[in-house]
């Protein structure tokens, strides 16, 4: 299984915005629009070999003491339950950890997304007991 994260450009834009997930995640088109407005956001396509299977976006959040945030993770509904999301998250977490000036990564998820919350806990994230808007705030400290 060759999971890689790739830049989104004119060559793969259409295939990335065509990826779908049933619930709990903004569309990839909306996320790409956010990345255009919030230029600190880094959107990436998730590929298994040469097949686009998902989308991930992270950033250093200037409105939150320059903390790292993983803003989005989605795996297309046809490609779920194959370990792609876990590998993509591990790649991003390892990349963020290379920045020795930080020691935590934040994300938030829908409180009803019990599968997602368990997924993030299995990666080492802990629920803080706080809400980020209407979502559960989770933090990975390292």
PLM-predicted stretches and their roles:
Residues 79, 83-91:
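Conserved acetyl-CoA pyrophosphate-binding loop and the N-cap/start of the following alpha-helix
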Residues 136-142:
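Terminal substrate-recognition subdomain of acyl/acetyltransferases
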Residues 76-78, 82, 111-112:
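Active-site acidic-Proline motif in GNAT/NAT acetyltransferases
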Residues 86, 111-128:
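Conserved active-site alpha-helix within GNAT-family acetyltransferase domains
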Residues 106-117, 133-135:
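Conserved beta-strand-loop-alpha-helix junction that forms the acyl-donor binding cleft
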Residues 96-108:
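Conserved GNAT acetyl-CoA-binding A-motif
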Residues 2-71, 76-78, 95, 99, ...:
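Acetyl-CoA-dependent GNAT
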């Amino acid at each position: 299984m060759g999971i890689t994260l790739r830049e989104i450009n004119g060559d793969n834009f259409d295939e990335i915005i065509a990826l779908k997930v049933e619930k709990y995640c903004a569309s990839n088109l909306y996320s790409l629009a956010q990345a255009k407005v919030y230029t600190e956001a880094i959107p990436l396509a998730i590929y298994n070999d040469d097949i686009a299977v998902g989308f991930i976006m992270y950033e250093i959040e200037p409105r939150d003491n320059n903390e790292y945030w993983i803003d989005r993770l989605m795996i297309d509904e046809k490609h779920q339950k194959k370990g792609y999301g876990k590998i993509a998250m591990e790649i991003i977490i390892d990349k963020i950890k290379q920045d020795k000036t930080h020691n935590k990564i934040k994300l938030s998820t829908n409180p009803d997304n019990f599968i997602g919350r368990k997924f993030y806990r299995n990666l080492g994230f802990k629920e803080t007991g706080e809400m980020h808007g209407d979502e559960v705030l989770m933090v990975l400290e390292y």
